[in-house]
Amino acid sequence: MEENSIKIHKWLYPASWLYGAGVALRNKLFDWGKLQSKSFNVPIICIGNIAVGGTGKTPHTEYLIKLLHDEFQVAVLSRGYKRHTKGFVLSTAESDARSIGDEPYQIQSKFSDIRVAVDEDRCHGIERLLTLKEPPVEVILLDDAFQHRYVKAGLNILLTDYHRLFCDDTLMPAGRLRESAQGKNRAQIVIVTKCPPDIKPIDYNIITKRLNLFPYQQLYFSSFRYGNLRAVFPDCATVQERKLSSLQTEEQILLITGIASPDTIIRELEIHTRNIDLLAFSDHHNFSQRDLAQIKERFGKLRKGQRLIVTTEKDATRLICHQELDEGLKPFIYALPIEVEILQNQQDNFNQHIIGYVRENTRNGSLPERKDAHKS
């Protein structure tokens, strides 16, 4: 395995012990029934993690949408982190990253035929979704809700970063775990994300032993597959799409990220060019006028004729909202989309696991059998 990037602040262990005691007590109250988890008469799939930072929740949620939405009426419910609204909001054609959050808006932009909603109170959000008719919701995907135990999901999918496995981490603030690694026991599926596409068989075995899962838990490994660069402002761009392979080694890229961990996208771009100027912001960062001015200044320092601005799909949703963004920059801004690939020839098994759960628990038991396994 590659050396992990985990940094533990040992001097913060006392604070972590206090934090851990509080989290453990909360989990025990749910286990003992003192705090109630609510079940719903609809298949609910929770996608989450037990660590702060990016593990690829949104790309994996999009994978599930692609897998299910041709057959079932899919809804996605998120908290809508850093949105400018409160309460339950159902996405519409007028929604943007400000009203529903960047990740829900990204999902709605790519899948206009599903319902996307946000609500801080997940139980209330589910209840509102279940009142929708024509057609009724048949499966709900809960984004980043592994610690939201007031909802009892029928299928819990836990993600852990290949470069930062939860078994190597410790509780906040010394580490990045939201709860003890024992929280993994609530998951029926564990996915090791962001794996190298050429991961060695011995690494599968090492990670499997280190995660130490129970027999009822299924373990999968996934990797990111990058698509073509797509113009964020297509009306301004002379080229709508560019293959990564078309990048020239001398081409200069200003990479703008507001995500938890930009390492993966940096590694991908470095395959094609070494001339990368990184402008990194915090996760879900709301770009200010000062930030936009900094982007313009940094881009202006790159050689004319051989320069490009690359950002993530999530960051693109927030850039689009800004009327203050310099018009001269728009033709040069491209988003780099990512898709999830299940490794080890386990894609069909994973797909059938998900589809089987939804079929067995849907309120509409008369759905026809799926003829072909999903291929992505």
UniProtKB/Swiss-Prot annotation:
GO terms for biological process: lipid A biosynthetic process; lipopolysaccharide core region biosynthetic process. GO terms for cellular component: plasma membrane. Its EC number is 2.7.1.130. It is an enzyme of class 2 (transferase). It comes from the Bacteria. Signal peptide: none annotated. Pfam families: LpxK. Keywords: ATP-binding, Kinase, Lipid A biosynthesis, Lipid biosynthesis, Lipid metabolism, Nucleotide-binding, Transferase. Pathway: Glycolipid biosynthesis; lipid IV(A) biosynthesis; lipid IV(A) from (3R)-3-hydroxytetradecanoyl-[acyl-carrier-protein] and UDP-N-acetyl-alpha-D-glucosamine: step 6/6. GO terms for molecular function: ATP binding; tetraacyldisaccharide 4'-kinase activity. ATP binds at residues 51-58. It catalyses: a lipid A disaccharide + ATP = a lipid IVA + ADP + H(+). Belongs to the LpxK family. Transfers the gamma-phosphate of ATP to the 4'-position of a tetraacyldisaccharide 1-phosphate intermediate (termed DS-1-P) to form tetraacyldisaccharide 1,4'-bis-phosphate (lipid IVA). PANTHER family: TETRAACYLDISACCHARIDE 4'-KINASE, TETRAACYLDISACCHARIDE 4'-KINASE, MITOCHONDRIAL-RELATED. This is Tetraacyldisaccharide 4'-kinase. It comes from Bacteroides fragilis (strain YCH46).
